């Protein structure tokens, strides 16, 4: 009979290396922990030196408060920290680090040197470790006020971990991404990065709106900021601010999404779900939204101690946070009008587009020129074109057919029109509506219009589809949902937790046209469904809705099914291709687009219009060269 192994304490070295497996995955993980310590120290400037993607050397130097010499050995001990003292501090954490594990874990898999000096000290002190259990030796050193941490030969004593590292470029790319995220979290701190002795990043302190906008443009690319909506709203103790990209500036990957809670970068499924809902019917299938958002909340209502790398958080009232995020973003996107999209040409950024750090855009950050609309969105009076489109009467174009008298027609083309036949011109540029006035129809599919910026091209079917869709949604919201009783109620077997959830949300289901009855601890009866969803699989829909309610505290599946049905109705009811429209009909469509929510995209997320400015047209014909 095999003897059972005895329980014994692990050695400090092995315990630290096990902890390092959670905290230290690659050089980017190390730089994250070191930068967070620098930010917590009150640093205003941080310098990072990297060699061989961070495997050979990682050095972080800051001008923070420094560490007293007596505390230096403790800084490398496990569970030793200056940031919390008791449980009450843990429940209201505002610092980025608080566990006291990072330096101990890093030092167990590398050769680490920590040098620091406080403002009241006459000299700096230094402590070193070499990835093994040893007595930390403190010695004097030369160093300005602040702290430097030098990490050499990462994973030198754990070769198995080192084998999992990627190429130097890949590891450095991950490291850059961490610095990008932290640079957006702290506009008041300057960041400088060098790789193999070459300067890569130079971000100066950004203490005003224009400087912050330049930093966002440097990190995310100028195109993002030109096509992003600045938002700021505060309600019920929650404050959300930042920039959300227009639906026309989407990505094929979720690589331009930055979200922060109290200055801490997080990747949270609740946040992702709320954002996905807000962009639901304005993004083309497979595309991802872009955003840089900051959520400020009372630290007591958010738990940051739920993940080894602190990437996830848990909110005390997750449903309130979810609804706040969704409602704010949904309204911001719904309020977008064509004039908001004219700051820059609409575009869909391809996955291969290089911007930010990879493109070296930081070097000229201070000289970066951004349009005034990016730095400060005007809040003027309602322009004169609002509501004025109905009175516009443009002349009917002559027939486009060719005749035998081509030469005569060609000469007649250059004959000036009589003054009475000319189209009425606006008194000033301010009187021109954002989408301008229609000029002609192309192949029965596109509308050509002229506005103050140049030429506008409109996909008339896509535009009319969105207008019809929004009207159907408004009508349904005002008239309510009609329920249709089932002749034979459907029985559905659930877990007791799901059945309890259905009973708790019975009134909510009723508002959406469902009537559910509890038959037993794990059984429900569906007695009524929305009349619009009579063809839907009611049992599976209820199951999916309950799963969402248990996961997120809310669900939009019923509304999504209804919207999908309305979108189909709008698609079939919209004006078809090859239908000839008169100029007044085209102008009426343009005016409707200017007053309709989300008119920049059809129900499937495709763009409904695009702008070709005079500069774009001049480039096509090589004018000005």
UniProtKB/Swiss-Prot annotation:
Pfam families: DNA_mis_repair (PF01119), HATPase_c_3 (PF13589), MutL_C (PF08676)
Gene Ontology, cellular component aspect: mismatch repair complex
GO molecular function: ATP binding; ATP hydrolysis activity; ATP-dependent DNA damage sensor activity; mismatched DNA binding
Transmembrane recorded as keyword: no
UniProt key word DNA repair: yes
Keywords for the protein's UniProt record, in alphabetical order: DNA damage, DNA repair
GO biological process terms on file: mismatch repair
SMART domains with a match to the protein in the record: DNA_mis_repair, MutL_C
Stated role: This protein is involved in the repair of mismatches in DNA. It is required for dam-dependent methyl-directed DNA mismatch repair. May act as a 'molecular matchmaker', a protein that promotes the formation of a stable complex between two or more DNA-binding proteins in an ATP-dependent manner without itself being part of a final effector complex.
Annotated family: Belongs to the DNA mismatch repair MutL/HexB family.
UniProt-listed NCBIfam families: mutl, PRK00095.1-2
Protein's UniProt name: DNA mismatch repair protein MutL
Species this protein is from: Stutzerimonas stutzeri (strain A1501) (Pseudomonas stutzeri)
Designated gene of the protein: mutL
């Amino acid at each position: 009979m095999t003897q059972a192994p005895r329980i014994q304490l692990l050695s400090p070295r092995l315990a630290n290396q096990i902890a390092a497996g959670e905290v230290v995955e690659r050089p980017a993980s190390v730089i994250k922990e070191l930068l967070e310590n620098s930010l917590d120290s009150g640093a205003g400037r941080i310098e990072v030196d990297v060699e061989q993607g961070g495997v050979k050397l990682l050095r972080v130097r800051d001008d923070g408060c420094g560490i007293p010499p007596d505390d230096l050995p403790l800084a490398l001990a496990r569970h030793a920290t200056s940031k919390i003292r008791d449980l009450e501090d843990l429940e209201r954490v505002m610092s980025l680090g608080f566990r006291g594990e990072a330096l101990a874990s890093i030092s167990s898999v590398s050769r680490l040197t920590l040098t620091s000096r406080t403002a009241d000290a006459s000299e700096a002190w230094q402590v070193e470790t070499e990835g093994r259990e040893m007595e930390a030796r403190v010695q004097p050193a030369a160093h300005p006020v602040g702290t430097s941490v030098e990490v050499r030969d990462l994973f030198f004593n754990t070769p198995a971990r080192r084998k999992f590292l990627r190429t130097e470029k890949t590891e450095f790319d991950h490291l850059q991404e961490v610095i990008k995220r932290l640079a957006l979290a702290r506009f008041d701190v300057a960041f400088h990065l060098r790789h193999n002795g070459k300067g890569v990043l130079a971000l100066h302190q950004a203490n005003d709106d224009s400087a912050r906008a330049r930093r966002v443009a440097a990190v995310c690319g100028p195109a993002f900021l030109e096509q992003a909506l600045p938002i700021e709203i505060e309600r019920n103790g929650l404050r959300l601010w930042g920039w959300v990209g227009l639906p026309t500036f989407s990505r094929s990957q979720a690589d331009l999404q930055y979200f922060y809670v109290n200055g801490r970068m997080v990747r949270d499924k609740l946040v992702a779900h709320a954002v996905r809902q807000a962009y639901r019917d304005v993004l083309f299938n497979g595309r991802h939204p872009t955003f840089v958002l900051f959520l400020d909340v009372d630290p007591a209502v958010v738990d940051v101690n739920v993940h080894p790398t602190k990437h996830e958080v848990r909110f005390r009232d997750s449903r309130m946070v979810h609804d706040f995020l969704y409602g704010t973003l949904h309204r911001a996107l719904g309020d977008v009008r064509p004039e908001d999209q004219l700051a820059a040409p609409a575009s869909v950024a391809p996955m291969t587009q290089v911007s930010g750090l990879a493109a070296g855009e930081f070097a000229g950050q201070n000289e970066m020129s951004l349009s005034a609309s990016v730095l400060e969105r005007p809040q003027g009076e309602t322009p004169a074109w609002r509501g004025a489109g109905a009175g516009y009467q443009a002349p009917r174009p002559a027939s486009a057919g060719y005749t035998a008298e081509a030469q005569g027609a060609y000469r007649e083309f250059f004959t000036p029109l009589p003054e009475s036949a000319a189209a009425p011109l606006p008194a000033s540029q301010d009187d021109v509506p954002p989408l301008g006035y229609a000029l002609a129809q192309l192949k029965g599919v596109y509308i050509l219009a002229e506005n103050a910026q140049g030429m506008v091209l409109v996909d008339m079917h896509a535009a009319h589809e969105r207008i019809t869709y929004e009207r159907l949604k408004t009508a349904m919201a005002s008239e309510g949902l009609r329920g249709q009783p089932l002749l034979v109620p459907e029985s559905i077997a659930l877990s007791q937790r799901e059945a309890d959830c259905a009973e708790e949300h019975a009134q909510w289901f009723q508002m959406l046209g469902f009537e559910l009855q509890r038959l037993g601890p794990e059984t429900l009866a569906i007695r009524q469904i929305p009349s619009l969803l009579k063809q839907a699989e009611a049992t599976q829909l209820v199951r999916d809705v309950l799963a969402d309610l248990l996961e997120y505290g809310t669900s939009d599946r019923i509304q999504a099914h209804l919207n999908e049905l309305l979108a189909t109705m709008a698609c079939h009811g919209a004006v078809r291709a090859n239908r000839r429209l008169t100029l007044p009909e085209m102008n009426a469509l343009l005016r409707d687009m200017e007053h309709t929510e989300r008119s920049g995209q059809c129900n499937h997320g495709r763009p409904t219009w695009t702008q070709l400015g005079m500069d774009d047209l001049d480039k096509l014909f090589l004018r000005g060269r």
